[in-house]
């Protein structure tokens, strides 16, 4: 860490948020005048009261935040397709921080770059992760699966109607054409039901999202993240939590369903 930071002119600080907090005292001493301190997330700087990450005045500070997982960023980079990303300049010491940041965004394969701030990036990112991208998505899936199972549907049927059809068919069409296209091109029965139930789901979960956003912007989610992820027993505790999901009937059914996809057939 020390050698890379001392020799580099663009220091990409890409440790986990808890890791950035732990290593900051070392890294901060290695930054040279005119360097760029580059983040892929606004967490450390935004929640400086909790992380202690306050960049020195003699460096540029910026971020490029890909809108996808690291796996997706790498996979898309290798196949030349790239992934959307936001960018922000928090501190422009050299007068060239904007140009340097955009160049870095292009270099990592971002096909579309849109401006933000460190604060807006972290509040939208944490809300999205805990919300529709992972937390809410898995929660809603689990709720529907459980209702179907409670009413006598088999694990395979419940999983296919809840997850497989969404991930293998519908979400791809939404990605290609938009949700409005999906509504216009599904069966009339699905169309009528979706139009009627969409506002009910929206109104039911809006208070949850409002609570979530407040928890993010107040710094409470940052506190929980740093506390949990900085625990010496973090890995063991995480494995225990993840094993509950992995061993659940729903996701065991999912493993069986995925194994039956044609691309997974063994010769």
Annotated model-derived regions:
Residues 2-3, 66, 117, 160:
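Proline- and acidic/polar-enriched loop/turn elements at helix boundaries
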Residues 150-267:
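NAD(P)-dependent Rossmann-like dehydrogenase/reductase catalytic/cofactor-binding core
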Residues 95-150, 156-174:
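Active-site-proximal catalytic alpha-helix in oxidoreductases
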Residues 1-2, 114, 157, 183:
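A generic structural-conservation signal
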Residues 15, 19, 93, 136, ...:
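Catalytic cores of large soluble enzymes that bind and process phosphate-bearing ligands
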Residues 3-6, 25, 29, 142, ...:
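A broad, structural surface signal
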Residues 38-130:
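Rossmann-fold dinucleotide-binding core
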Residues 1-53:
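Rossmann-fold NAD(P) dinucleotide-binding segment
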């Amino acid at each position: 860490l020390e050698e890379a930071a001392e020799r580099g002119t663009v220091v990409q600080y890409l440790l986990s948020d808890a890791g950035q907090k732990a290593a900051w005292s070392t890294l901060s001493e290695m930054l040279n005048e005119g360097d760029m301190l580059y983040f892929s997330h606004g967490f450390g700087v935004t929640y400086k009261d909790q992380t202690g990450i306050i960049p020195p005045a003699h460096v540029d500070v910026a971020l490029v935040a890909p809108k996808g997982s690291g796996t997706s960023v790498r996979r898309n980079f290798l196949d030349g397709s790239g992934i959307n990303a936001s960018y922000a300049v928090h501190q422009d010491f050299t007068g060239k921080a904007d140009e340097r940041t955009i160049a870095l965004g292009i270099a990592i394969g971002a096909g579309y770059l849109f401006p933000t701030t460190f604060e807006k990036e972290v509040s939208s990112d944490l809300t999205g992760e805990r919300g529709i991208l992972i937390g809410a998505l898995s929660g809603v899936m689990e709720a529907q699966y459980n209702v179907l199972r409670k009413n006598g549907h088999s694990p395979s049927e419940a999983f296919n109607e809840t997850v497989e059809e969404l991930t293998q068919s519908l979400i791809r069409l939404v990605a290609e054409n938009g949700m409005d296209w999906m509504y216009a091109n599904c069966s009339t029965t699905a169309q009528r039901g979706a139009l009627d139930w969409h506002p009910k789901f929206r109104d039911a979960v809006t208070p949850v999202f409002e609570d979530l956003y407040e928890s993010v912007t107040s710094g409470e989610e940052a506190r929980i993240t740093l506390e949990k992820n900085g625990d010496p027993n973090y890995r063991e505790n995480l494995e225990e939590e993840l094993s509950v999901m992995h061993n659940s009937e729903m996701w065991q059914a999912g493993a069986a369903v995925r194994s039956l996809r044609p691309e997974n057939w063994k010769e």
